[in-house]
Amino acid sequence: MKVDVLLGLQWGDEGKGKVVDVLTPNYDVVTRFQGGPNAGHTLEFNGEKYVLRSIPSGIFQGGKINVIGNGVVLDPLLFKQEAESLAASGHDITKQLYISKKAHLILPTHRILDAAYEAAKGSGKIGTTGKGIGPTYTDKISRNGVRVGDLLHNFEEKYAAAKAKHEAILRSLNYEYDITEMEAQWLEALNYLRQFKLIDSEHVINNYLKEGKSVLAEGAQGTMLDIDFGSYPFVTSSNTICAGCCTGLGVSPRNIGEVYGIFKAYCTRVGSGPFPTELFDEVGDKIGQLGHEFGAVTGRKRRCGWIDLVALRYAVMINGVSQLIMMKSDVLDTFDTIKACVAYKMNGVETNEFPYEIDDTIEPVYVELPGWKTDMTKMRSEDEFPEEFNAYLSFLEEELGVPVKIVSVGPDREQTIVRYTEE
């Protein structure tokens, strides 16, 4: 067996939680391989809405194994809150969830450092969620991090050393803080974490594959936020692309199977950073209102714009996407015409390749397509798709070179249509 991967192809918030919930019945194991509690996956189960920040979305499927991989950074306090919320709703996850010993811990001082660094940047801030993600990955790369497996040996010494280094940095920044209460809660949450099975996830995942178990790897955020290939420096601190699955779980590239690339029928972005197709008019406001575009974790209003095929082609290439999944098609139901960016104009020169750096001087080159002007929310089969919508899908497939296999026409699970188009 191979690991199938589900990835966001834009700037995050594509709707991965819902799609994972639809796909998980087909898998034995669901994993997370990167990121932390800065991004939430929203999904509905039995009429209830849940936001999962660190726990894999397969947790609602009875009998599924869920693994938090080594590439994830874990905040014990936020993890405890998330797990207890699930338990209060009748979901006991202690037997279903395994955690990699090699996953790094987000310390209380990481969160303080995050706030201090952002404050020091002034107008140049990147819009961090303040969850300590960046400083935790910084410590990981500089070999100063504290890992989940350290709970089993010499934890107090390693924690004290990391905390002392952080406090020295904060003194140099003249940043005032008090972590007394947060630290007490965090240390209490560590004890809660100990009840879960702490594993050498690379061995466990590869043994599952040898046993013939099917594995789905669930990415967080989106390709355009990747630390290497995203719109740097307005990116996250981990590899959100398909290659991140290999390093974040310990699997060979030869063991990657299907790569599902998920995108919205339009674009959104949260926080600072370039956004070539952003709309500042009533059209952008309308998309945001119809799409309920607010962050699952931060509650921040998302910036909205037309679909960017330059960025999407780039994301498809980087990830080796084999199947596309389009979300929120219904949000565009009422538009007379729909625009799609097919190229950028930079210094008067047109290009269809994603550049080294994108900024406000980039001018999107649009094509216009007729809208379908039809309520798609009640459709349950591709046979019901209006002609204009089929034309839009064909246009996207031609531009991206990959079939759109799944179309979402609403937030509920049954509003997910699998297309049976030929290869």
From Swiss-Prot:
GO process terms (BP)? 'de novo' AMP biosynthetic process; IMP metabolic process
Per the record, its GO cellular-component terms are: cytoplasm
Molecular function as annotated in GO: adenylosuccinate synthase activity; GTP binding; magnesium ion binding
Domain of life per record: Bacteria
Give the EC number(s) under which this enzyme is classified.
6.3.4.4
Catalytic function, reaction form: IMP + L-aspartate + GTP = N(6)-(1,2-dicarboxyethyl)-AMP + GDP + phosphate + 2 H(+)
Q: What is this protein called?
A: Adenylosuccinate synthetase
Query: What is written in the cofactor note of this entry?
Result: Binds 1 Mg(2+) ion per subunit.
Residues the entry annotates as binding GTP:
12-18, 40-42, 302, 328-330, 408-410
The protein's required cofactor(s) are namely: Mg(2+)
Q: How does it assemble?
A: Homodimer.
Name of the gene:
purA
- Which HAMAP family does its entry note? Adenylosucc_synth
Broadest EC class?
Answer: ligase
The residues the record assigns to binding IMP are: 13-16, 38-41, 129, 143, 221, 236, 300
**Primary site of residence:** cytoplasm
Q: Which InterPro entries match?
A: Adenylosuccin_syn_GTP-bd, Adenylosuccin_syn_Lys_AS, Adenylosuccinate_synth_dom1, Adenylosuccinate_synth_dom2, Adenylosuccinate_synth_dom3, Adenylosuccinate_synthetase, P-loop_NTPase
Which pathway does it operate in? Purine metabolism; AMP biosynthesis via de novo pathway; AMP from IMP: step 1/2
State the organism of origin.
Parabacteroides distasonis (strain ATCC 8503 / DSM 20701 / CIP 104284 / JCM 5825 / NCTC 11152)
Cite the binding residues for substrate. 296-302
Cited function: Plays an important role in the de novo pathway of purine nucleotide biosynthesis. Catalyzes the first committed step in the biosynthesis of AMP from IMP.
Q: PANTHER family annotated for this entry?
A: ADENYLOSUCCINATE SYNTHETASE
The similarity comment for this entry is: Belongs to the adenylosuccinate synthetase family.
Query: What are the record keywords, sorted?
Result: Cytoplasm, GTP-binding, Ligase, Magnesium, Metal-binding, Nucleotide-binding, Purine biosynthesis
Q: Which PROSITE patterns match?
A: ADENYLOSUCCIN_SYN_1, ADENYLOSUCCIN_SYN_2
Where does the record say this protein resides? Cytoplasm
UniProt keyword Ribosomal protein present: no
Q: What does the entry list as the binding residues for Mg(2+)?
A: 13, 40
